[in-house]
Regions:
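Catalytic cores of Mg2+-dependent Asp-rich isoprenoid enzymes
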Residues: 1-162, 167, 171-287
Length: 287
């Protein structure tokens, strides 16, 4: 067993606080039990994502991810060793959390170890499904739903959120040698990989960002169109995330998108909380 001294739930809270993520703004209206389940789920995502981000030796990275695959098996055999999985254990059966989604998340992180380019959107969409849609579907189970179409909503929302991350982090990822935008789409705009990696500022970069933003907006709208009125109340935290990221997309387009490789557009904590409150009272950005 890992020699952790911190209480498992406190460990998960600390892990999520370190990330400074927008997800925390979405949790503020949740009851304690659901909030703790979401925090444990997100802490798991942080653990495996940190391996993909920080491990420079792919072999070591794969070994660490394999440890997590084994740990998920131990979790479902009621013998978890890590504080994150110990914190998750009470919620597995309570919220009917499917083991395969956790394995898919790990598989997505392994893609980050193996690939730093994606040939086309089909490849990228698989990556987005594994690292984001799976999390959305698990979250939807925790929030609760009555209509199975809500899982389609969660799937598409995950794609939309991850595409937004990719647009926002285009310059940051380029500095790490990563290009998530499909290469065939760069080629159509006559943008070379080296131009992305060198952080050029150009109108064709603006065109690229506009095109990628339109695709993300499509998936947000596809998600919302699949969310049953029966489930809007329970799925409010996901809607908060959707609105925060949708507003972020709009800000990216307003903030000189041709310069996205040299600047990272962010929303203030106050703005995120404002969006969360407005969403709670049923204000809609995505129509």
């Amino acid at each position: 067993m890992y020699p952790f001294k911190m209480n498992p739930q406190e460990y998960c809270k600390q892990k999520t606080k370190e990330s400074h993520s927008s997800f925390l703004s979405a949790f503020i209206f949740l009851k304690k039990e659901k909030k703790n389940a979401l925090i444990a789920l997100y802490a798991f995502c942080r653990e495996v994502d940190d391996i993909a981000d920080e491990c420079k030796d792919n072999k070591i990275g794969k070994n660490k991810l394999n440890w997590w695959r084994s740990e998920i098996n131990r979790l479902y055999n009621k013998n978890p060793q890590h504080p994150v999985t110990i914190a998750l254990e009470p919620y597995i059966s309570k919220y009917n959390l499917n083991k395969l989604y956790f394995i898919e998340i790990i598989d997505g992180m392994e893609m980050d170890l193996i690939f730093n380019r994606y040939k086309n959107f089909k490849q990228l969409q698989l990556y987005c499904y594994r690292v984001a849609s799976t999390v959305g579907i698990l979250s939807a189970h925790i929030f609760g739903f009555k209509d199975n179409k809500t899982l389609t909503y969660a799937h598409n929302l995950g794609i939309a959120l991850q595409l937004t991350n990719i647009i926002r982090d285009l310059g940051e990822d380029a500095k790490r040698g990563r290009i998530y935008v499909p290469l065939d789409e760069l080629k159509k705009l006559n943008i070379s990989e080296s131009e992305i990696l060198k952080n050029i500022k150009d109108k064709k970069i603006k065109d690229l960002v506009v095109n990628q933003t339109k695709r993300a907006q499509y998936f947000y709208k596809l998600a919302i169109n699949n969310l049953s009125n029966l489930d809007k109340k329970n799925q409010k935290p996901g809607l908060i995330m959707a609105n925060i990221y949708y507003v972020l997309l709009s800000k990216i387009i307003k903030d000189r998108p041709e310069n996205i490789l040299n600047q990272k557009t962010l929303l203030t904590k106050y703005r995120k909380l404002q969006i969360a409150l407005l969403t709670f009272f049923n204000y809609e950005w995505i129509k």
